[in-house]
Amino acid sequence: MQSLSRRKRDSVPNLYAKCQLSGNCLPDVKNKVEADTLADRLLRWLGSVIYLGGLGIGTGRGSGGSTGYNPIGAPSRVTPSGTLVRPTVPVESLGPSEIIPIDAIDPTTSSVVPLEDLTIPDVTVDSGDTRGIGETTLQPAQVDISTSHDPISDVTGASSHPTIISGEDNAIAVLDVSPIEPPTKRIALATRGASATPHVSVISGTTEFGQSSDLNVFVNATFSGDSIGYTEEIPLEPLNPFQEFEIESPPKTSTPRDVLNRAIGRARDLYNRRVQQIPTRNPALLTQPSRAIVFGFENPAFDADITQTFERDLEQVAAAPDADFADIVTIGRPRFSETDAGQIRVSRLGRRGTIKTRSGVQIGQAVHFYYDLSTIDTADAIELSTLGQHSGEQSIVDAMIESSLIDPFEMPDPTFTEEQQLLDPLTEDFSQSHLVLTSSRRGTSFTIPTIPPGLGLRIYVDDVGSDLFVSYPESRVIPAGGLPTEPFVPLEPALLSDIFSTDFVYRPSLYRKKRKRLEMF
């Protein structure tokens, strides 16, 4: 049996070139030529994360990448790249035109141009053959006129005349005509608004031969031209620059700390919803907080700057000196902080022992006691004088200007009236006086009223003892309505007693009620 041999197919580039037109290429051929195999996809995916350029990883030809293979240890060679560029023909530089030298002018010469007498020869016109009337033809002489222009030497004024040069044959006359000055141009620049494009209008003025007119030039500062060429730009610096610097605020304490960490730690430990906030004004919180918790003797020289624990017997329950510190079993050391108003706050964290289990564990709420210290006002600044002798200062003291004169007669006290000034300020003293009753008759009887024993009267004696009582007057403001400012409470019942009368006044309740009898008919 004859074995069948497998024929090798054509190369991949040839197969792709033939099947590309028909569009029926094999997947492996198409993916290999278009670099879309699995290896190419992995290379693109990994190349977006790490750099794999220049390694030649792919399904292409094994040429070692774009640079080829180099033997190990051999230096890499640098291949020349790029094309040589020849310089072009240099461009002519822009600049001023060539300056034509001008003849020097002698300052000693006169500025007046002398006039010369020119002789004009007679020109004879030869008419040729003489013919009759109507047959004679006049032929004028041909005159050649040539002008030469020299921009420097040919300078003519307002009164210049043409120069006539005649030859020897007196047949040809040459006129040397001077060039006419160009007409004067007036340049006027006008703009319309800040953003409008300026327009240049040139006005030509007509001048006569040998005359000149003034040149009027109007310059507008808003019109800007184009600068041709390189100009050096020099940066300008201010003569007296302002120095900028930052001022750092000095620390308020000798050992500054991080404000953020301190605020977070304080808020986490003292200011949370599980801690009761109690402000107190008990000064014992600053030095010895045990005085506000329990009764007892303590050493005043002992400074308790540590956490204190108080143990109590439940059978001997005693009230705390301060009600806010009741049932406190533990109180911490003092902590100093600063409030929003800038005051110093002394804080202590305590714990109450309100509940005790059978095992002996005490449970209670955490309490934050804080005391805000008052601010210390700054003392008034006192201007101190310089010690020793010094010059440059002079003080003028006028006692009449600085002192104030008060005349009590011209300016009386408005609080005292004339009637009050007549009153005797001395108090009367009747401690050693005797009551003497005299009468011109014998057997005269005097009736001295007595106070009933049932009346509760309070008698005020002005001269009690030998001391001096000073009474300060009080002013009471009465409004316009006539009512006093203090609340008025009437005294009920009111008991009236007149000690100077000789009769009694019965109360209406003491009278017997009379019954009205009606007669029946």
UniProtKB/Swiss-Prot annotation:
GO terms of biological process kind: microtubule-dependent intracellular transport of viral material towards nucleus; symbiont entry into host cell; viral penetration into host nucleus
One GO cellular component term noted in the UniProt record for this chain: host cell nucleus
Localization (cell): Virion; Host nucleus; Host early endosome; Host Golgi apparatus
Keywords associated with the record: Capsid protein, Cytoplasmic inwards viral transport, Disulfide bond, DNA-binding, Host endosome, Host Golgi apparatus, Host nucleus, Host-virus interaction, Late protein, Microtubular inwards viral transport, Phosphoprotein, Viral penetration into host nucleus, Virion, Virus entry into host cell
Highest taxon of source: Viruses
One family name in Pfam for this protein: Late_protein_L2
Residue ranges annotated as motif Nuclear localization signal: 1-10, 512-518
GO terms assigned for molecular function: DNA binding; structural molecule activity
Post-translational modification: Highly phosphorylated.
Function field: Minor protein of the capsid that localizes along the inner surface of the virion, within the central cavities beneath the L1 pentamers. Plays a role in capsid stabilization through interaction with the major capsid protein L1. Once the virion enters the host cell, L2 escorts the genomic DNA into the nucleus by promoting escape from the endosomal compartments and traffic through the host Golgi network.
Complexes and interactors: Interacts with major capsid protein L1. Interacts with E2; this interaction inhibits E2 transcriptional activity but not the DNA replication function E2. Interacts with host GADD45GIP1. Interacts with host HSPA8; this interaction is required for L2 nuclear translocation. Interacts with host importins KPNB2 and KPNB3. Forms a complex with importin alpha2-beta1 heterodimers via interaction with the importin alpha2 adapter. Interacts with host DYNLT1; this interaction is essential for virus intracellular transport during entry.
Family indicated by similarity: Belongs to the papillomaviridae L2 protein family.
Protein name, UniProt field: Minor capsid protein L2
Organism of derivation: Human papillomavirus 4
Lineage: Viruses, Monodnaviria, Shotokuvirae, Cossaviricota, Papovaviricetes
